[in-house]
């Protein structure tokens, strides 16, 4: 298993070194009883268990101290085409606010296929410009497909849009935090992979999922069974990867961006050497607790040892 060790010397920036040992990395955030993010914890304030067995923390740090690798995953299927377009300036402002000098992000758009519209860039302005071009609907077939090509005429490949970038866009040499922000209603009808595979891919590659959900009601403004299922899917994906599920239709994209930015700036990362054998192909449950009562920890629920 690849793990990331953070080394720092007095006043110097931290450096990430990836080594082949049985270490597990976990990004997590903590909230108090009022829902406010807690950003002042130390290694001595938290405990971690794997499958109920206490683990020794070998690394603890603030996520803001390491580079951010961010993926923007945009649903451009028929029901979602009007979702992000009016908020491109808000998206650009969010990226400018959340991305520091060493941070970088990529852009993927998906409907029946998953396509890389912009590879990693340190400029939020460039990413939004690429999205504007993709929104025009011209030349989309020229964007490279992420993952194996699938023959699909119509449909929405929501699960593939998480599974493929989680596996392919965050390589072993990628330093720092890993996150995907998914803009969608969570509905899927043409993926080659299923929901559990998408969650497993994110957990295995230390990717946190932030879901900005926009649900277009059915006829007469009623919420359909498909709407409800998509809502539950996005909530589960965010919960099991330690991220955030946000109803952007009800509360607005600006507020969603604010909450995601706050969590990214206030989260932590820890590492421990697992007592379980590497590559046993079983699911190992992770639990992080704070010694202070009344705090809620959001982290991935576990991982499959590969």
Spans of model-derived segments:
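Scaffold/interface architecture of coatomer-like assemblies
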Residues: 11-306
């Amino acid at each position: 298993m690849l793990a990331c060790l953070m080394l720092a010397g007095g006043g110097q920036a931290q450096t990430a070194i990836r080594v082949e040992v049985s270490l597990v990395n976990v990004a997590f955030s903590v909230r108090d009883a009022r829902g406010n993010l807690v950003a002042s914890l130390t290694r001595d304030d938290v405990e971690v268990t794997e499958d109920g067995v206490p683990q020794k923390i070998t690394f603890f740090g603030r996520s803001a101290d390491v580079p951010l690798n961010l993926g923007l995953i945009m649903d451009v299927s028929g029901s979602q085409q009007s979702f992000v377009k009016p908020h491109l300036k808000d998206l650009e402002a969010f990226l400018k606010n959340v991305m520091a000098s060493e941070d970088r992000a990529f852009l993927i758009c998906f409907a029946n296929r998953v396509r890389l519209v912009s590879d990693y860039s340190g400029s939020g302005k460039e990413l939004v410009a690429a999205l504007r071009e993709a929104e025009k609907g011209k030349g989309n077939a020229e964007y490279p497909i992420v993952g194996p090509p699938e023959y699909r005429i119509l449909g929405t490949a929501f699960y593939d849009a998480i599974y493929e970038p989680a596996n392919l866009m965050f390589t072993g040499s990628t330093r720092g935090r890993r996150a995907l922000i998914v803009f969608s209603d969570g509905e899927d009808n043409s993926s080659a992979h299923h929901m559990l595979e998408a969650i497993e891919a994110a957990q295995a590659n230390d990717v946190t999922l932030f879901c900005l959900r926009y649900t277009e009601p059915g006829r007469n403004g009623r919420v359909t069974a498909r709407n409800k299922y998509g809502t539950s899917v996005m909530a589960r994906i965010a919960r099991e990867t330690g991220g955030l599920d946000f109803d952007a239709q009800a509360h607005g994209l600006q507020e969603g961006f604010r909450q995601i930015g706050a969590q990214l700036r206030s989260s932590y990362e820890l590492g421990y050497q697992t007592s379980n054998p590497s590559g046993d192909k079983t699911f190992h449950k992770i639990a992080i607790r704070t010694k202070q009562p009344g705090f809620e920890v959001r982290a991935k629920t576990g991982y499959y040892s590969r």
